[in-house]
Amino acid sequence: MRPIRLVAAALSLTFAGPSFGWIEYQSQADHFSINFPDEPEVRDIEYLTEQFLTLPARLYSYEDGPSRYSMTVVDFSNTEQMHAERLANCEAELGGGDSCNNPWSTELRGAMVHAAWNLMQRAAQVTHFSYYFSDLVEGQRLHLTNADGSRTYAAIHMHENLLYIMEGTVPAGAPEPALFQQSLGFIDEAGDRIRYRSIYTNGFPPPPSFTYQ
């Protein structure tokens, strides 16, 4: 993945009750912006795909008492080449046929579904699962009730072959983490936020867009 450069800007937010300071956090390496309670921890990790590729990924996370916030970004840009290398000897070993077809396009198109499936396998009850979009980048949204009564609010998107998995978990009885949930944006190389004029679907030509700061 690309070298990481990060930008964080302070937000001043007021509630009916205590006042909390959040930041608008940007990762120019992974082309997104999102609100966190404070600077998140960033770790390089690995991600196993549905077709058993191990891809480079990055985990951005922050714990605020019993509440947890995270963004996982997985780089799918080299999946075609990686599958081709894995199938290099397929015809000689298996004699060709469907077993030797490169599944990279299926891998890309199914990435969000597989990520949602992984969330559903947790020891939690799924209470909501729907189509969703953020800044007109399409995705999926899930709500889960965990064994301890806490609630996880997750959203999954794919933009320019990067898979984004965001999760906000709050204690039982706490309100939804709206400041986190509703803040996701996608940014260009200059750090400007991209806004599409119609729905963006990964793998298809992007619709017209404009940028703003």
Give, region by region, the residue ranges found by the protein language model.
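Bacterial N-terminal signal peptides that target proteins for export
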Residues: 1-8
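Hydrophobic helical h-region of N-terminal Sec-dependent signal peptides
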Residues: 9-13
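Short N-terminal segments immediately surrounding and downstream of signal-peptide cleavage
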Residues: 21-39
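A mature extracytoplasmic/lumenal domain signature
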Residues: 29, 38-40, 46, 75, ...
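Short, solvent-exposed coil/turn segments at beta-strand boundaries
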Residues: 35-39, 64-67, 136-137, 157-164, ...
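Surface-exposed amphipathic alpha-helical segments
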Residues: 40, 93, 109-122, 160-213
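Conserved polar/disulfide-associated segments of primarily extracytoplasmic proteins
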Residues: 48-151, 155
